[in-house]
Design a protein with these regions (language model features):
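Polar, glycine-rich mid-to-C-terminal structural blocks
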Residues: 253-254, 270, 274-362
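Conserved, well-structured interaction surfaces
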Residues: 44-48, 52, 57, 90-165, ...
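Membrane-proximal, proline-rich intrinsically disordered regions
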Residues: 24-77
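Short coil/turn linking the two alpha-helices of tandem helical-hairpin repeats
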Residues: 159-160, 166, 251-261
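Bacterial N-terminal signal peptides that target proteins for export
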Residues: 2-10
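Bacterial Sec-type N-terminal signal peptides, specifically the leucine/valine-rich hydrophobic h-region
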Residues: 18-21
Length: 362
């Protein structure tokens, strides 16, 4: 779906068409001539792709966008890099791709690691916009609502990390004015910069994310934990929506630039947090563990991160599990990243006998 090539390919297609007007008239009774837009997309595949963007790098081992290392494009890996590495919780010893500056809380527009997060989120948004633009997608109200929540989550992360990012809710826009549905604030005939047309402000984005989540909620599945044998396992439900609303409201003061005047939003944050707490989702504790797991000395927290956490009982507290398995979703951005990249002082080092050196991680 190389939508960014529209302006180049469409004129070429028009030129070829004009050169063949002497052909039969039936040859002109065509549908969309833009080869970058599939007139009959695989709805199920596109729906799955919207979820895959949370944990996968791409469809075939390569990233969804141009990058030197596909593993660096994974959303989960980038969320860890920017939520944990700049804090005292973790440090990264690597020096490539700008991660050293992230460790030191030095953020500049040219930082490659920062770009990876931005490009991943915009890539996800493009797939979500595509799905939501299709008439056929609206036939299943539940799945349509799920993707609305996924897109709202993408923009919530953009709001949280970047403040005032580019906002686009259309596909294949020819001009910045056609990139979204909120052009009433711009006067016709007046010249605006690209940033003015596409960056609508943190207050706008806060209100938009809130409205999308509230609009999607009624059509979502009920808040209910599932196991990996259930067909609805891994899907967005009302619990996911409530949790995201609670997080949005909790930090409203920053997003709306009105710290100290947020009692109404704190009350809303509490309301939606209590909805999750009072739902069927529960914390995984000893009473829910199998006798075998107890005999092996595991704690409930341990089982949350096991390969069988979709069937060992731990999924009772997983509001939005990110789906991975060793056969279908391999990569260096998800769980493999945490296994291969993390090390602490109590772990044995791995010796590279050929190089006569030791390595703690990658």
């Amino acid at each position: 779906m190389k939508l960014n090539k529209f302006n180049i390919i469409a004129p070429a297609a028009a030129l070829l068409l004009s050169a063949s007007l002497s052909s039969c008239m039936d040859d002109l009774n065509k549908g969309n001539i833009d080869p970058t837009v599939d007139a009959n997309p695989n709805i199920t595949g596109l729906y799955s792709k919207c979820y895959a963007g949370l944990i996968m790098e791409g469809n075939d081992g390569n990233a969804d966008f141009s990058i030197d290392d596909a593993g660096k494009s994974c959303l989960l890996r980038n969320l860890f890099n920017f939520n944990e590495v700049p804090t005292d919780e973790a440090a990264c010893w690597w020096s490539d791709g700008g991660i050293e500056d992230v460790t030191k809380n030095k953020f500049e527009s040219g930082n490659a690691t920062l770009k990876n997060l931005y490009y991943r989120l915009m890539s996800n948004i493009s797939y979500e916009n595509h799905f939501l633009s299709l008439d056929a997608a609206q036939e299943d109200k539940t799945k349509y609502a799920e993707v609305r929540v996924l897109r709202a989550y993408s923009y919530f992360l953009m709001l949280d990390f970047f403040g005032d990012p580019t906002f686009i809710d259309k596909i294949s826009p020819e001009t910045p004015r056609q990139a979204h549905s909120y052009n009433s604030k711009f006067e016709e005939g007046k010249t605006y910069t690209r940033a003015e047309l596409l960056q609508l402000g943190r207050e706008f984005l806060f209100n938009w994310v809130e409205s999308e989540l509230l609009a999607a909620e009624p059509d979502l599945l009920e808040a209910k934990p599932e196991t990996d044998t259930d067909p609805n396992y891994g899907r967005v439900d009302k619990g996911t929506c409530w949790l995201l609303l609670s997080r949005l409201y909790l930090n409203a003061g920053t997003y709306l630039n009105n710290d100290g005047q947020n009692n109404q939003y704190w009350d809303k944050a509490l309301e939606y947090a209590e909805r999750v707490i009072n739902s069927d989702y529960k914390l995984f504790d000893d009473s829910k563990m199998s006798n075998e797991a107890k005999a092996n000395g595991y704690k409930p927290y341990d089982l949350l991160f096991m390969g069988d956490n979709g069937s060992n009982g731990a999924s009772c507290e997983a509001l939005l599990p990110l789906m991975q398995d060793g056969d279908k979703t391999q990569g260096y951005g998800g769980s493999m990243f945490f296994v291969a990249a993390l090390w602490d002082a109590t772990m044995q080092t791995v010796t590279d006998k050929d190089a006569a050196t030791t390595a703690n991680t990658w």
